């Protein structure tokens, strides 16, 4: 079940269509997926090709998907961080806009590392939005 503004949707396609229509209605130039935690369909991506960005809690291409923080700890990584990238059909695979790194401490657990990464995300997301806007407005993404 998908919900949007108190409205229930049984199918993902109907849910995405509602969102797409709303974004088109408001002539949205950039879609920012921060905390979205859902994989969008090719239908959605193609409606806003090169105009969707996502923030992800790892230094991509390492640790794609929903368990990036847990995986970085379990694999004994010493450094992690966050990445902002353009959204493509393959999960966490689009062109990188910006990354920031931090050390994983010996006493870090999923909760403590998540909080530290989130603080880093809050620092780079505004700059990434500005950079993405520049790339879109100058049509740079066609050759990116």
List where the protein language model places each region:
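One-carbon transfer enzymes
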Residues: 3-144
